Amino acid sequence: MSILDTAKAGNVLYEVGAYNLPTTHQTIERIYQDLLPHQEKFCKDIDHRKLALVCGFGAGKTYALCSKAVMLACMNIGHVSAVFQPTAPMLRDILIRTFNELLDQWQIPYTFRASPLPEYQLSWEEGTHTILLRTMLTYQRLRGQNLCAVGFDEADTIPKRDAESAMNMALARLRSGNVQQFYATTTPEGHGWAFETFEKNKKSDTALIQAKSSDNPFLPDTFIPSLYENYPPQLIKAYLLGQWVNLTSGQVYDRFSREDHVIDKIPFDTKMETLLCGVDFNVMNCNCVVGVRDGEKLVIIDEISKQKDTDALAQEIK
């Protein structure tokens, strides 16, 4: 018999006397100590089968996801759950790194297996729980698994159809344990999967929690002002305020305003002005806008469209 078979599990860096396995109750108390209000609301909700936390950059989405995963593990001793990231690099660089830091912080003994597929086994006085780590585009590998919980991080960054297929596969696996739940955290990426699932087509078993970047008081003082300085209004609404914004269709120039950029009458004679032409060359569909300078500004005075070739466009400009 190996000495390792008789030694109690623990971490040599823990405080004196902490070699005993923690109870699940102790772990849940430790997790709640550091949660922000929106994270706590997300972690406490075990009544909805589908749950999402949608918020701006830096609001603590991945922290909330890991907290939720461990709390559900505490409630499902002896069972298996899974957590997904969009890509393998994100799984390695974001999720695993965050899990390692938090498991040590919460003093949870664990073993990590990297191959053939990554997974954690967490240990408590009451027993163990296994968390599988996977990428969303490999969701087909869940076939045959009996899971108690499945979590998605940043699911809105993959195509809507793939995210929906992955979610449907996950929901079909939720058939073991004491608490079954599908949960997701993401930044809103337009009217994508998260909007369709948790807002537009929301069902009675579905809940949505939203938060702003500013709801995290621990962000650097320069973080939010810097984004306001560099982001256009549409991205500010999505990536700082956590709001649903159509980022992919509709008005091409979202900062265009007819009130600010359209005038009824040109305030000077343009006949002697140099014409500035912006041309889109195509076969059978040449287009052009014609403008003149007004000091530092450019005034567009005409538009020519659907000319068959360059010569026809030139004649029209003359």
Language-model regions, residue ranges each:
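Conserved RecA-like ASCE P-loop NTPase motor core of nucleic-acid helicases/translocases
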Residues: 79-91
